[in-house]
Amino acid sequence: MEALGMIETRGLVALIEASDAMVKAARVKLVGVKQIGGGLCTAMVRGDVAACKAATDAGAAAAQRIGELVSVHVIPRPHGDLEEVFPISFKGDSNI
């Protein structure tokens, strides 16, 4: 199973900038975006652990330049049950 990288921002523009930076910085796939409320937005990427770490680092830096970065986290091996509850499944070709 691949790692899961997440970035949460306050504001959609910062999240879009962070998402763009993440997919450009490493071989990751953007698998979800969620607007939570109160201006909070989260983007999720999947890839190997190193790629998710590089992507979230780049995304965090980009978000901080544009708006407010709230949180960044990488789960190296998310449990399979998470995919049944949260929209984090990697669906697509294997050469991301």
Swiss-Prot record:
Pathway: Amine and polyamine degradation; ethanolamine degradation. Keywords: Bacterial microcompartment, Virulence. Pfam families: BMC. Changing A58S: Still interacts with EutQ. One of its GO terms (biological process) is generation of precursor metabolites and energy. CDD domains: BMC_CcmK_like. Disulfide bonds: none annotated. Its main location: other. Residues 3-87 form the BMC domain. It is found in: Bacterial microcompartment. The keyword Cytoplasm does not apply. GO terms for cellular component: ethanolamine degradation polyhedral organelle. The need for a bacterial microcompartment in EA metabolism can be bypassed by increasing the levels of EAL and an acetaldehyde dehydrogenase (not necessarily EutE). Probably a major component of the bacterial microcompartment (BMC) shell dedicated to ethanolamine degradation. Each homohexamer has a central pore with an opening of up to 8.6 Angstroms. A positively-charged funnel leads to the pore from each side of the hexamer. The pore probably allows metabolite passage into and out of the BMC. Expression of eutK, eutL, eutM, eutN, eutS (eutSMNLK) in E.coli leads to formation of a single BMC. Expression alone leads to thick filaments that interfere with cell separation. Homohexamer with a central pore of up to 8.6 Angstroms diameter. The hexamers pack into a two-dimensional array. Interacts with EutQ; a probably cytoplasm-facing helix (Val-49 to Gln-64) interacts with N-terminus of EutQ. This is Bacterial microcompartment shell protein EutM. It comes from Salmonella typhimurium (strain LT2 / SGSC1412 / ATCC 700720). The gene is eutM.
